[in-house]
Amino acid sequence: MMVHCAGCERPILDRFLLNVLDRAWHIKCVQCCECKTNLSEKCFSREGKLYCKNDFFRRFGTKCAGCAQGISPSDLVRKARSKVFHLNCFTCMVCNKQLSTGEELYVIDENKFVCKDDYLSSSSLKEGSLNSVSSCTDRSLSPDLQDPLQDDPKETDNSTSSDKETANNENEEQNSGTKRRGPRTTIKAKQLETLKAAFAATPKPTRHIREQLAQETGLNMRVIQVWFQNRRSKERRMKQLSALGARRHAFFRSPRRMRPLGGRLDESEMLGSTPYTYYGDYQSDYYAPGGNYDFFAHGPPSQAQSPADSSFLAASGPGSTPLGALEPPLAGPHGADNPRFTDMISHPDTPSPEPGLPGALHPMPGEVFSGGPSPPFPMSGTSGYSGPLSHPNPELNEAAVW
C-alpha cells in the first residue's frame, strides 16, 4: 500500500519520511508556509499550515502596541500598564528618545508617551502662552478633565487663572512624586468653532464623525470625545439651573397672605364686604331688628283695645327718630325724662291709618283724629325691658301692632 504525502499528496517513495500531525510528509514538504524554510527540529501549525517559530509568533503572537506587529519570543520588550512594546517602539513622541527602564514618563491615549523633560518644558511654554491670551478663550483640555469648557470670551481671565493654578498643582505633584495628569491640549479658536458647529448638529457624535473632526481640526480623537462629554454635561447643568429658576419664580411671584395659627380675626374679615354697617360703640338711641310686635310700658288702659282699631304714633321729642323701612324699634335703656312713646290714640271710632309702605310706620300728630288727643300713658321711670331682646315686664300688658 502506497503512503501519500500530506503536503503534496503524492506517494512517498523516499527511504525516510517525517510524521507531522499524525500524517506522513516528504522531508522536502515540511517547510514554513511563510518563509519556505525547511523545518527539521520544531514546527508550529495553525489551520493545517506549518510555520517556523518566528513567523508563527509574528503572525499569531502578542502584538506591539506601538507598531501593531507581532513580537517574537526572542525579542526584548518593554511593558507599560497592560501594553507591550518593542524596544525601538518605546520612545518619546516629542523627541523620539528611547525610554529606558525606571524612567518617568507620561502616558497619552494608552500607547503614546512623553518623557519628563519634554512634559515639563511644554507645561512652562503653555503657562507663558496663557498669560498672553487677550481676545478669545482657548482653554486647555486634558483627556481626564471632566469640567465643561468655558466658551464665553468674558470668562477669559477666569479660565487663565484656573489654568495657572492647574499648572502649579501639577508641578507640586511632580515634586511630591504622586500620580499626575497627562499634558493638556490647547484648543484654538478655529478648532473650537468647528467643534461647536458639530455639537449643534449632533450632541453625541459617532466614532466616524469624531474621526472626521479629528482630521479637520488636527486634534486627538480622545480630546474630541472628552470635549463632547464636557459640553453635554454643561448643557444638562444649564437646563437644571434654568428649570430651578423657573420654579422659584413661580413660587415667589404671588405670595399669599397667611394668618398665623391661633390668630384672631379682624372685624372686617368677619363682616366681609356686607353693605350693612356695624356700630360697636354707638351710645345714642338706636333701632335694631326685632319681631312684628312691640311692648310698651304703660299703665292700665281706659278701655279695651283691639289690634284692628288701635294705632300707635311715635314720639317726636328730642332724641327720637322716625321708624325706617324694615326697622321696627328696639327697646333700649331710657330714663323717665326721655319717654319713647307718649301718645296713643284710643278712640274706638277712629279708623286705623293705612301704611304707605309695607313694614313702615309714619308719625302723625294726634289732632288729626276727630276724637282729639287722648290722654297719654305715662312711661315708667325704670325700663320695663330686661335685656337686649326686648322681653316685657311681666306686670305690663301686651298689645300687638299688626
UniProtKB/Swiss-Prot annotation:
Residues 180-239 bind DNA. PROSITE patterns: HOMEOBOX_1, HOMEOBOX_2, LIM_DOMAIN_1, LIM_DOMAIN_2. Residues 124-186, 298-402 are annotated as: Disordered. InterPro entries: HD, Homeobox_CS, Homeodomain-like_sf, Lhx1/5_LIM1, Lhx1/5_LIM2, LIM_Homeobox_TF, Znf_LIM. It is found in: Nucleus. GO terms for molecular function: DNA-binding transcription factor activity, RNA polymerase II-specific; RNA polymerase II transcription regulatory region sequence-specific DNA binding; sequence-specific double-stranded DNA binding; zinc ion binding. Residues 3-61, 62-125 form the LIM zinc-binding domain. Keywords: DNA-binding, Homeobox, LIM domain, Metal-binding, Nucleus, Repeat, Transcription, Transcription regulation, Zinc. Residues 124-148, 300-311, 322-336 have a biased composition (Low complexity). Residues 151-167 have a biased composition (Basic and acidic residues). It comes from the Eukaryota. GO terms for biological process: cell proliferation in forebrain; cell-cell signaling; cerebellar Purkinje cell differentiation; cerebellar Purkinje cell-granule cell precursor cell signaling; cerebellum development; forebrain neuron differentiation; hippocampus development; neuroblast proliferation. SUPFAM superfamilies: Glucocorticoid receptor-like (DNA-binding domain), Homeodomain-like. SMART domains: HOX, LIM. GO terms for cellular component: nucleus. Pfam families: Homeodomain, LIM. Plays an essential role in the regulation of neuronal differentiation and migration during development of the central nervous system. This is LIM/homeobox protein Lhx5. The gene is Lhx5.
